[in-house]
Amino acid sequence: MDTILVFSLIITSYNVTKKELRDSSCQVEPLPDLFPKDVRSIRAELIREAQAEAKRPMFIQNQTVAILQCLGSGSKVKVNLVHSEKRQKVKHILKNLRVMTVPCRNSTAPPSCHLTPASKVQAGFLVTGKAFLPGVSQCKVYPVMGASSETYPSTTTSVTPGKKGEKTTKVDGFSSPLNQDTDENLEKRKKWSIVVKVLIAVTLFVSGIAITVFVIFEVPCPSRCQQVRELCQCQRLRRRPRKEDQQPGTAESQSDTQPKKVGQEAPNSSSPKKAVEITVVHQTYF
């Protein structure tokens, strides 16, 4: 029994969620129609936009750039954002997430941000948030990693100037081919595997302790076990007298059968006496 439990624990220890989604990430970059083709560096253009916006009297510091919706299998969701240089009194805000800026190695490459959740995000959960970044007017979200068969969510947002210096956002439809059913199935498998592992471990632990204590060290059973033993002994003692009572009964039955035979033989023994008496009577008449 213990060997079966050990092997079952080894089998269940195998990761049942092997088909879990790979670490996915999303990247936000400006659309190609936003900047002219002759611009060599997008960063320079963003700096120009930032300087132009700084000169305006009505400048909105917190600007909604995109609604980020990414599927991540790990506790960290990586999102690369193209944004302008940081300014004073302007915060990069992402609801329920925190932004960690990473310096760029190449001067021509745009700066990026790693969006890590403030609280740990479990595998398969949909991470949503709004990024408020200055200097970016149009963005799109597309996957950086992933195979050709796997498709990831993509959304485009455009910011257009409105009345009184206000800016509005337009968010396209969010397509998520990765169904949430797969995520729920993975979570259920994880939960059941944990439950099975715990049950097997508990049974192994209890059985191992019982074997080592009562079999190897020969520790006497507690009071309950002694009571059970006494009951078993009483039942055995009750059964023995019954067997002894049955044996004398058979002997008496045999003795009862023997007198019947004697009684049957008695009439035969009395018959000669009668014959003798008859003969004596016949002799007196002569």
UniProtKB/Swiss-Prot annotation:
Regarding the membrane, this protein is recorded as: Single-pass membrane protein
**Sequence segments annotated as region (Disordered):** 152-182, 239-278
Q: Does the keyword Kinase apply?
A: no
Location in the cell reads: Membrane
Give TM regions: 198-218
Keywords linked to the UniProt accession: Membrane, Transmembrane, Transmembrane helix
Q: Which Pfam families does the entry mention? A: DUF4711 (PF15829)
Q: What is its main location?
A: membrane
Query: Where is this chain compositionally biased, Polar residues type?
Result: 247-257
Task: Give the record's GO CC terms.
Answer: membrane
- What name goes with this protein? Uncharacterized protein C17orf78 homolog
Source taxonomy: Eukaryota, Metazoa, Chordata, Craniata, Vertebrata
